[in-house]
Amino acid sequence: KGGNFSAAHVLDLESFEQVAVWHGLEEPYQFGRILFNMGEFYNCALLAPERNNNGISVIDYLRTNSYPRLYRMQKFDYQVMDETERLGWMTNAHTRPLIIDALKESVRSNSIVLNDADTLAELRTFIRNQKTGKIEAAGGSMDDLVISLAIGCYLRSILPTDFYDGDSDSSYLDKMKERWGQGHTVAVGRGGY
């Protein structure tokens, strides 16, 4: 593969349309800057960067620069017997099936509108491995756009309650109602993201 590319999707929460895509090879802090700018352009969109590998540096950039809406993932910590929250999304053996199933359902039901040719091309090569049974990129293909999209599909299915804005006592919907007087974000030319 030559390394993983960074990938980001902007999905409209109401229409479930893919309205923007970014894909490329960037250093983590530069990708953090790109996400910050994309999120800001799309009305402070909820960002859910992967925590895996260099994703910690991306999250660190966003947190250090006070990006206002970062997804927080809840996890039960058996050492302290309490639930903890961590910024970003962790893709692992337990969470990968969740995001892949959400993506499959979104595509199967035709509820998502995909506009990016590169995303569609990756989806065509994202297949079930006959030996392992795992759904993954076919040999020589990439899946960065697919995994990014799958995370977005899953998070859309569980919104509006799981996000970080510095105040974990309020839900996303309450915050948006407080800020905008309605249940979703609105800006001229850009809907809720």
Q: Which ranges hold each PLM region?
A:
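RNase H-like, metal-dependent nuclease domains and their acidic two-metal-ion catalytic environment used
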Residues: 1-87, 93, 97-101, 105-193
